[in-house]
Amino acid sequence: MLDLTYELPKPKVIAGAKHDWELVIGMEVHAQVSSNAKLFSGASTQFGAEPNSNVAFVDAAMPGMLPVINEYCVEQAVRTGLGLKADINLWSAFDRKNYFYPDLPQGYQISQLYHPIVGEGEVLVELGDGTARMVRIERIHMEQDAGKSIHDMDPSMSFVDLNRTGVCLMEIVSRPDIRGPEEAAAYIAKLRQIMRYLGTCDGNMQNGNLRADVNVSICRPGAYEKYQETQDFSHLGTRCEIKNMNSMRFIQQAIEVEARRQIAIVEAGGEVEQETRLYDPDKGETRSMRSKEEAHDYRYFPDPDLLPLEIEQAWVDDIKSKLPELPDEKKARFIKDFGLTDYDASVLTADLESAHYFDAVAKGRSGKLAANWVINELFGRLKKDDKDITDSPVSPAQLGGVIDLIASDAISGKIAKDLFEIVYTEGGDPAQIVEERGMKQVTDTGAIEAALDEIIAANPAQVEKAKENPKLAGWFVGQVMKATGGKANPKAVNQLVAKKLG
């Protein structure tokens, strides 16, 4: 973990008409497992395929078809649990969650209510202002995804696409440790970052591969601390669940809107009803979807078609030994080994591809110089072209070559930016480009002195002003750089200007 000290962020406080109120948030995140096949069938999980083309007999609940568990999905769930510093349960079991919906052909969902595969873990959520909160993970269980109902193809009929039916989901359940909309979004972002590093979920929210159910309640200041001391939920308000959120921006908006709705109800003397709600971003409101069900409403019972899932500790240990360096550890290493600021290290570890790129550029070079060029020059140029690091036309070796030329005083900083632009747009070896195009820095003090003498002779008035006010000597530095096409060594120029005007 990061060897840094963080302050806890202050909880979000919303002023009601009568009192101040704090927010308490817990999240159930549904992450689609990165796997080529579904949880209990060999059908493809490819996104965007023709409707009902990725459906096995077991997905369609054909009579006599039995589920067969996909070992790779189990491995991905274990890998995710290990990445979240969670306990792995060597014995887990599947249960049937019974409910009727057109896109659920079995009439039940196979899940893990009583014995999940992953137990308690934790996630460090940083907010970018020097504060961070450790959010506790209660459990992770595997379950089947449902299909998709389509209502906009025909005015009189609805259709069902079963391609998604049976795809493996990991439901990551947090404790009610999140205290504001920004924290909720940061928590989702951190989970996505970790799972992308692990390769267990691509985190694509637009495709529905990562979505969240957000549980929101309100309490008076001080009540949450009593809950922490006693773990007694009666100190907290009644929670409402906002279902199927697939946008961090909408998650923040929905939490704020729902909290204000609850505050208005309580301050008017009413009681908040526990229910499931939907967020309407167009109207900026949540609306009731259904009363919040409890576990007994779904008549859970052990799935008779599936044996308990037993895994060996040696198998778990083998998976653990092959885990990649995760974001927190990578960030700590960048700060320690390269002397980076917390901010720069956060930017460079935001995604795995950027971290790998920086690692390659910084190897054997100044980490701070490498970070400056990757973040300010490369990322800035990529953003301008609406590209990401995977589309970079400049390889780590090429950018490293530019940095080497700067470090060896072969080129100046100004020329380096021109060189970078050439490499970005045309490609090529930086050192060769410098040689062929005559871009090498002028280090011959005789040539620099000759240029400076000409400028001094042509500008006697500026010389007198510079002698009276040494800060104006910078004008002469600029003129020399201009006269040499930016090739003069800035350090040598400054020394000569100071000598002649001092």
From Swiss-Prot:
Quote the EC number.
6.3.5.-
Its Gene Ontology molecular function terms?
asparaginyl-tRNA synthase (glutamine-hydrolyzing) activity; ATP binding; glutaminyl-tRNA synthase (glutamine-hydrolyzing) activity
Q: List the disulfide bonds.
A: none
One Pfam annotation, family name? GatB_Yqey
Q: Which UniProt keywords apply?
A: ATP-binding, Ligase, Nucleotide-binding, Protein biosynthesis
Reaction catalysed by this chain? L-glutamyl-tRNA(Gln) + L-glutamine + ATP + H2O = L-glutaminyl-tRNA(Gln) + L-glutamate + ADP + phosphate + H(+); L-aspartyl-tRNA(Asn) + L-glutamine + ATP + H2O = L-asparaginyl-tRNA(Asn) + L-glutamate + ADP + phosphate + 2 H(+)
Please state what class of enzyme this protein is.
Answer: ligase
Q: Which GO terms describe its biological process?
A: glutaminyl-tRNAGln biosynthesis via transamidation; translation
Q: What family is this?
A: Belongs to the GatB/GatE family. GatB subfamily.
Give the multimer and partner information: Heterotrimer of A, B and C subunits.
Give the matching HAMAP family: GatB
Q: What does this protein do?
A: Allows the formation of correctly charged Asn-tRNA(Asn) or Gln-tRNA(Gln) through the transamidation of misacylated Asp-tRNA(Asn) or Glu-tRNA(Gln) in organisms which lack either or both of asparaginyl-tRNA or glutaminyl-tRNA synthetases. The reaction takes place in the presence of glutamine and ATP through an activated phospho-Asp-tRNA(Asn) or phospho-Glu-tRNA(Gln).
| Listed name of the protein | Aspartyl/glutamyl-tRNA(Asn/Gln) amidotransferase subunit B
